[in-house]
Amino acid sequence: MAGPTAPTTAPTAIRAGGPLLSPVRRNIIFTALVFGVLVAATGQTIVVPALPTIVAELGSTVDQSWAVTSYLLGGTVVVVVAGKLGDLLGRNRVLLGSVVVFVVGSVLCGLSQTMTMLAISRALQGVGAGAISVTAYALAAEVVPLRDRGRYQGVLGAVFGVNTVTGPLLGGWLTDYLSWRWAFWINVPVSIAVLTVAATAVPALARPPKPVIDYLGILVIAVATTALIMATSWGGTTYAWGSATIVGLLIGAAVALGFFVWLEGRAAAAILPPRLFGSPVFAVCCVLSFVVGFAMLGALTFVPIYLGYVDGASATASGLRTLPMVIGLLIASTGTGVLVGRTGRYKIFPVAGMALMAVAFLLMSQMDEWTPPLLQSLYLVVLGAGIGLSMQVLVLIVQNTSSFEDLGVATSGVTFFRVVGASFGTATFGALFVNFLDRRLGSALTSGAVPVPAVPSPAVLHQLPQSMAAPIVRAYAESLTQVFLCAVSVTVVGFILALLLREVPLTDIHDDADDLGDGFGVPRAESPEDVLEIAVRRMLPNGVRLRDIATQPGCGLGVAELWALLRIYQYQRLFEAVRLTDIGRHLHVPYQVFEPVFDRLVQTGYAARDGDILTLTPSGHRQVDSLAVLIRQWLLDHLAVAPGLKRQPDHQFEAALQHVTDAVLVQRDWYEDLGDLSESRQLAATT
């Protein structure tokens, strides 16, 4: 056979993601996605140690919780829309738009002159952050081969966990040494770098069919949640509980929630189908997830306020002194996920977690201005461990007890309740704190003869003489510890519900117990295909092999020929043309090593060759179809152990299985089945 023509540049018109992107280009894209997720995740916690300074400069202690709450709400509401818009417009366009929105929100946050402007800017920033997070996961799934996807997405998930440590530290340092405004502006240069890579390196990817988006459901649940949080935050502080404003908000929220339930029962693509709550396991997990979010963000937000006003800690020191809680949370969360994945037992963990949270808040309610920092750190470790024991395992329980068709919405549902709980926790802690402080601050100011402007600033407060500062410090200490005492009742309710949690056998379809993104991140809308791919990617390392296929009756091809056949099929699906020189270039192997194998395909009628260009013949396409049937059957045999699949209607599962089978054929690199290069040469030389 004539040798190939002169090498051509590798094709760039990619129709679908896969392993044929060069490793360098793929890693550049993935690094940009990691940094995108990093700035989105950091935005959630970086503001926490800066809050006392922000309140001192902008005023309005009543509205301080909105600096955290509005970000969470904005990110949660946009998740479903961003995922569906990615299907409709293309992931890269949505990523570019999301980063722009995030940058605009970050700039406006840094320019804010009032707490109201900051809250609105934070909501805009949260919208961008939520869209970045969900789009980054989707893009990683498209540019990374199926077999490597778990490892890459695990890195994205770990970013959320790492950020829980680094966010408060960075926010504290920037506040002390630059300005609290830099806690927002620091995102801009990183985001511009992400924009540059996304605009230049991400290929044009295939779009799935036009999705169905539950716009009305998203709008209604956003209105209901926002109204409830506003009522919680303003009740008893800005407005009396019996005022027309608060009553109107509560009535409006109740009407919106009722309409949402009615609407979701009839929606074609419901974001939270009411049928999910027919499962006692799902219903209890949602409530427990709410409690976990309530405790985690409530504590993360108000512990630094305690440390600043009561202990006189700087913003940097406050960030450092929250580390015991975060470390306890991370260790307990990852360890619990691994243990549940190995043992299949889960009930003990949320029970123990809720108990530890109740004990921790009770201990924290006994703190005062003389409590040693070491003892405070111990209490925070207990609190973090309690949150960690509960948080990750709740996602895992829902993923392993839901039916196949509901896995995506069930996972995003339980995560949604955690985020809503975090919003309510921050708002409730803030409202209680303002109420308790107002009762004490007047007498404290009188007894200490302190000028009012000195009160909002922790730094100024602790520079006052002891006789003047002590009554104010005591007022803050008693108010915050009373808030912690109120939190005990919420965790006790969670403990009782955890005791009622029914333990059922776990399925095998989703055991990504160490994916911190599920526990720490925003909700992610997963389709049935996404869920099935999660199961398949775990089976691939020890899964179907070309050697197994070659031994099947009627195959008629050896391992090397099967590999060559699939390479032509992959390149035809992914590129405009199949060139032998391009195959060698992508594999970093001289094309002459594999040329005899492709020539044998031509001789047997499975392929045709015109110089450097290869194509499959009708016989070759039929052979690929036969391989797809064998792979599909292998997947069915191994997925049959998952009870959730047995309850799934055939048509949806069949469609998802076909999608995943095709992804295996197109995205899997079968090169490892040939062994090392010397074995490949021997196979290529064999007739």
Swiss-Prot record:
Domain of life of the native organism: Bacteria
InterPro entries found in the cross-reference section: MFS (IPR011701), MFS_dom (IPR020846), MFS_trans_sf (IPR036259), Sugar_transporter_CS (IPR005829), Tet-R_TetA/multi-R_MdtG-like (IPR001958), WH_DNA-bd_sf (IPR036390)
Alphabetical UniProt keywords: Cell membrane, Membrane, Transmembrane, Transmembrane helix, Transport
Entry's family note: Belongs to the major facilitator superfamily. TCR/Tet family.
GO molecular function, one term: transmembrane transporter activity
Pfam families: MFS_1 (PF07690)
Keyword match Magnesium: no
Species this protein is from: Mycobacterium tuberculosis (strain ATCC 25618 / H37Rv)
Its membrane topology: Multi-pass membrane protein
Protein name, per record: Uncharacterized MFS-type transporter Rv1877
PANTHER family per the UniProt record, alphabetical: COMD, MAJOR FACILITATOR SUPERFAMILY
Residue intervals passing through the bilayer: 28-48, 66-86, 94-114, 126-146, 154-174, 182-202, 211-231, 243-263, 287-307, 320-340, 348-368, 378-398, 414-434, 480-500
Cellular component terms (Gene Ontology): plasma membrane
GO BP annotations listed: transmembrane transport
Cellular compartments annotated: Cell membrane
